[in-house]
Amino acid sequence: MKTYYEKDANVDLLQGKTVAVVGYGSQGHAQAQNLRDSGVEVVVGVRPGKSYEVAKADGFEVMSVSEAVRTAQVVQMLLPDEQQAHVYKAEIEENLREGQMLLFSHGFNIHFGQINPPSYVDVAMVAPKSPGHLVRRVFQEGNGVPALVAVHQDATGTALHVALAYAKGVGCTRAGVIETTFQEETETDLFGEQAVLCGGVTALVKAGFETLTEGGYRPEIAYFECLHELKLIVDLMYEGGLTNMRHSISDTAEFGDYVTGSRIVTDGTKKEMKRVLTEIQQGEFAKKWILENQAGRPTHNAMKKAEQNHGLEKVGAELREMMSWIHAPKELVKK
């Protein structure tokens, strides 16, 4: 595994260049501010609206996406996956110049062919492995979060060096930047989200909650046992792996882990995981998601509404009112 650190990157490669950060959401605001604090000239390309005003208030020169691309030598695409291809076609493609670098923090649109940059530009990825607020906070504390780096197209012969300079400007070389490919990052990221982090976990939590409530137990108790305490366990795994978690829980819980876990996640579950991975690798999920967006998201919106009305959500909202240490956001935001 090739990993790059501070000594392997030179942020001075960005001196005399302008970086255009396209999008000013969670990652956009963090990466733009970190780069600026590292002495890099940054402009923000967004359409008029809330993000435009926030970027202006943060002191950036804000302009249209097309103008930002014309101004910059390095263009970082930090829009949501489903918006990138349209914005690229409408505002970026015709403004690209020979020798520019087009950067991404997720490989979806390049890997699945939704964006096909011309051969005369560099195409690379710098993907911090943390949400934007953490990218910014850790940087301000003098540290950094790990990241992935990949080069899809090296027109200039310096794509990796410039990508590492960008990663250093964001603060990621302080922690370590791991070399990967667009294919590996995209396919593993989608699989992790679907099979484990989002799809797998939410299905497991709901199934546990439903099993207890259908067995006659009160929803409030089921919520605590199947959702609320999940954070306690995940934090232990996050800090020191499965061994640390098992060392920290009771012996009763640890024994139950060993003898019961494989009854829940069975060989059949793993076979289904492999099917999910194959669908991702073959582009079936990407095609489904692209078509879903083109159709106005009817399935997505219907499923989202149904999930929001699940009994788990109702009792959870009531119980969280008892928890003074939880500061629920006034509006849900994408991280």
UniProtKB/Swiss-Prot annotation:
NADP(+) binds at Y24, G25, S26, Q27, R47, S51, D81, E82, Q83, Q84, G132. Disulfide bonds: none annotated. The lineage of its organism: Bacteria, Bacillati, Bacillota, Bacilli, Bacillales. Mg(2+) 2 binds at D189, E225, E229. Its cofactor is Mg(2+). One of its GO terms (molecular function) is ketol-acid reductoisomerase activity. Keywords: Amino-acid biosynthesis, Branched-chain amino acid biosynthesis, Magnesium, Metal-binding, NADP, Oxidoreductase. This is Ketol-acid reductoisomerase (NADP(+)) 2.
